[in-house]
Swiss-Prot record:
The active site is at 173 (proton acceptor), 410 (proton acceptor). It comes from Arabidopsis thaliana. This is Coumaroyl-CoA:anthocyanidin 3-O-glucoside-6''-O-coumaroyltransferase 1. The modification N-acetylmethionine is found at residue 1. Signal peptide: none annotated. The keyword Acetylation applies. Keywords: Acetylation, Acyltransferase, Transferase.
Length: 469
């Protein structure tokens, strides 16, 4: 297990912004989809790529193109280079980009004392080992008038000479969700990879759309409620990593065959014999394995009186093209546009003989209910479900999704040899992505105490064997 990461040597820290004059100074309001993220930790991710060249080649041949393409990308994804502005209450926070002044911090670093292969491995590693290759988001600036200005994003690219490169990102989630972040990364990747080619021959992703923020109307003071909670906390406190002790992170992959075995079992056991999706059955299996791990370690595991206790899982449904406004929110909308849904299953069902079926049925029912309902009408009740989730034992949520295509990020070096969603370590999250080998499997990231990780691994392997027979 990787126990410690020697801090990389900082080669350069600079500021990257859109080309001057290409984006006018712009203010964007926060929507009721953005407001819940005001008080939550940063969203951090790492992409590892094989790279056999020297530091000199990296600095001369790769970094300049990476910087230039990032600048062009920020011309279209400019809020990432801007600030989150937090005025004194009662004025609401908003996003602002100031042409010629705002930028994101871009760090170039070198690591010569850490084994790249161990760092990107799937095996358990202390959660702190990845923090050295994460960028440091600058602290907020507070004006004499008490207006707080928070940077939104920072990037860091670290070379491990002769072995690989890591591109790290840290951002406040209030500006946009994973759909937007994936869009941003793929646009940047496409520009970087196409360097030197005729622009007319380069196929780039569609441009993001910012203009429809004003049409996202709050259906019932949803955003106001989140603002009140944000103000009641210490809004001057800048969200950052608080590293729990004795925690490790590990990656597990379910192959296509293993997933198909799970799907067949669930379909056979289901009363209506309905087929189940890869996402649902994988999530059900991992959630059950995680809850079994946590309950097994709990002092209350033998208590019969808590058999009717309910465990909760938070899922998210993308509301793009689903909200009943005059016009739909387009798929390329820049911002947060996710509706939270709470899946609830009783303890005795989630730990019983047909636990995966119970979890799968509950997840499927919740998704169908959300997709068939008027999401705007249900929005005022989302907070009730989230509060119930927060107050429960072992609240679990999801980060990422296989459909985001997070391994489809070729900067001219080939696809990533590993991707990590780092912020799952802040508690209770399961990271999901497509498997990196392109076999239609699913990759899962988990953060737990070392002892619990061993238990989780054992329970997971037992489950895989059970459903293989």
């Amino acid at each position: 297990m990787v126990a410690h990461l020697q801090p990389p040597k900082i080669i350069e820290t600079c500021h990257i912004s859109p080309p001057k004059g290409t984006v006018p100074s712009t203010t964007l309001p926060l929507t009721f989809f953005d407001a819940p993220w005001l008080s939550l930790p940063l969203a951090d991710s790492l992409f590892f790529f094989s790279y056999q060249n020297s530091t000199e080649s990296f600095l001369q041949d790769f970094v300049p193109n990476l910087k230039h393409s990032l600048s062009i990308t920020l011309q279209h994804f400019f809020p990432y280079a801007g600030k989150l502005i937090i005025p004194p209450r009662p004025d609401p926070p908003y996003l602002h980009y100031n042409d010629g002044q705002d930028s994101l911090v871009f760090t170039v670093a070198e690591s010569t004392e850490t084994d790249f292969d161990q760092l990107k491995s799937d095996s358990p590693k202390d959660i702190s080992v990845l923090h050295g290759v994460l960028p440091k988001l600058p602290p907020p600036h507070v004006s004499p008038e008490g207006i707080q200005m928070r940077p939104i994003m920072a990037m860091q690219v670290t070379i491990f000479p002769g072995a690989g490169i890591c591109i790290g990102n840290s951002a406040t989630h209030v500006v946009a969700d994973g759909v937007t972040f994936s869009h941003f990364m793929k646009y940047w990747m496409s520009l970087t990879k196409s360097s030197g080619k005729d622009p007319a021959t380069v196929l780039l992703p569609s441009l993001p759309i910012h203009s429809c923020r004003n049409m996202i109307k709050d259906p019932g003071e949803v955003g106001a409620g989140h603002l009140e909670r944000f103000w009641s906390q210490n809004s001057a406190k800048h969200s950052s990593h608080v590293t729990p002790e004795n925690m490790v992170r590990a990656t597990f992959t379910l192959s296509r065959k293993q997933i198909d075995n799970l799907k067949s079992w669930v379909t056979e056991q289901s009363e209506n014999q309905s087929p189940v999706s890869t996402f649902v059955v994988t999530l059900a299996f991992i959630w059950v394995s995680l809850i079994k791990t946590l309950v097994q370690d709990s002092e209350t595991k033998a208590n019969e009186e808590d058999k009717d206790e309910v465990f909760h899982l938070m899922i998210n449904v993308d509301c793009r093209n689903r909200l009943k406004y005059t016009q739909p929110i387009p798929q390329t909308y820049f911002g947060n546009c996710m509706a939270p849904g709470i899946v609830s299953v009783k303890k005795h069902d989630l730990l019983g003989e047909k636990c995966v079926l119970a979890a799968s049925d509950a997840i499927t029912a919740r998704i169908k209910d959300m997709l068939s309902s008027d999401l705007l009408k249900t929005a005022p009740r989302w907070g009730q479900g989230v509060r119930k989730w927060v107050m429960s034992h072992y609240p679990t949520s999801i980060a990422g999704a296989p459909k985001l295509g997070l391994y489809d990020m070729d900067f001219g070096l080939g696809k990533p040899c590993k991707m990590e969603i780092v912020h799952i370590e802040t508690g209770g999250s399961i990271a999901f992505s497509e498997s990196r080998d392109g076999s239609n499997g699913v990759e899962i990231g988990i953060a737990l105490e070392k002892k619990k990780m061993d238990v989780f691994d054992s329970i997971l392997q037992q489950g895989i064997k059970k459903f293989a027979t």
